Amino acid sequence: MATAEVLNIGKKLYEGKTKEVYELLDSPGKVLLQSKDQITAGNAARKNHLEGKAAISNKITSCIFQLLQEAGIKTAFTRKCGETAFIAPQCEMIPIEWVCGRIATGSFLKRNPGVKEGYKFYPPKVELFFKDDANNDPQWSAEQLIAAKFCFAGLVIGQTEVDIMSHATQAIFEILEKSWLPQNCTLVDMKIEFGVDVTTKEIVLADVIDNDSWRLWPSGDRSQQKDKQSYRDLKEVTPEGLQMVKKNFEWVAERVELLLKSESQCRVVVLMGSTSDLGHCEKIKKACGNFGIPCELRVTSAHKGPDETLRIKAEYEGDGIPTVFVAVAGRSNGLGPVMCGNTAYPVISCPPLTPDWGAQDVWSSLRLPSGLGCSTILSPEGSAQFAAQIFGLNNHLVWSKLRASILNTWISLKQADKKIRECNL
């Protein structure tokens, strides 16, 4: 094991077909997930040694978990540790495979006769399967999972927990689907697992997401598939066939790092009419940072220095970086409308209204001449979010943070409702 000389590794906690899990004696609540150079299909009815697969799988999982973690998805991932292992929070695994897909293919067609391959699901289709090798992982309903009354790390898996995993599965699929699109790859479907963190008692995405976990079709073309299906489809396993499978896996591993970047640049420029509005603008900048969007603050008055306002506008128009302008001006807001009337870039007015004159001042942002499409958002955080939604159309990293934020808000409401109901009992 590559990491044995640097980590104080304890007993083996679990061994599966393609990985082993070890306790870390110096890091309570953490484990080491060690991948194997083994590939399997059909619940290990077919299995082969594939040199280098452990490193490939570990790289893919580490990149995908990093992508999801940075977006805001709770994952059982701490850091990559060597070429073939990573460190993660220890979890008690929930024995369910959650499958989510956009395109009908594979076993779905067998289970749903009459549905043609290529049928698309809107929203993505979520299914669950009980992990039971002896019975070929039978499909379960949500009701069966609830009725099982599983308890992991002290958390009983009830309706709330099932709903959380179902919604998280869809969000995770959509984030990965969106992330693969810039690479001209279609994420057809995927399977994931959740666990309960033994320390926080939270449900988190766990196990691995590697090239065994999904169907990935370059250019949306099944004949170009780069996932484990290419191994399943081998009529006979030969050295040449395994080499072809390995090349497919290497192809994915080379590109997965690109998912952590975006070629689409973005920027928010906040124009304030006075430094007295700095506190309001700092809130916008902080919120932009949460979405990974660079934000610059400038001071200019469209009333007192319109020439300088337009010069600043031209400065940002000239460097080719996609930009959203946010105008922050109290009292009579000339800044937003003047900017909007002189640029093709999006402009958001975010006036810092005061209790005394706010009801009157806001009309200078709302009632505008024809030909102006300047939006008005009163919340500093809301204006940053709207800018993020604009950039998210072409930037998968920004979009992923938005999607994860929607999921996390939904989960917090679901958990709050559960807590209130328990208090009423």
From Swiss-Prot:
Extract the InterPro entries matched here: PurE_classII, PurE_dom, SAICAR_synt/ADE2_N, SAICAR_synthetase, SAICAR_synthetase_CS
Query: What's the Enzyme Commission number for this chain?
Result: 4.1.1.21, 6.3.2.6
Q: Which residues carry this modification: N-acetylalanine?
A: A2
Question: Which residues are reported to carry the modification Phosphothreonine?
Answer: T238
Positions bearing Phosphoserine: S27, S107, S274
Q: What are the recorded GO MF terms, alphabetically? A: ATP binding; phosphoribosylaminoimidazole carboxylase activity; phosphoribosylaminoimidazolesuccinocarboxamide synthase activity
Q: Where are the Phosphotyrosine modifications?
A: Y22
Q: Could you identify this protein by its name?
A: Bifunctional phosphoribosylaminoimidazole carboxylase/phosphoribosylaminoimidazole succinocarboxamide synthetase
From which organism does this entry originate? Pongo abelii (Sumatran orangutan)
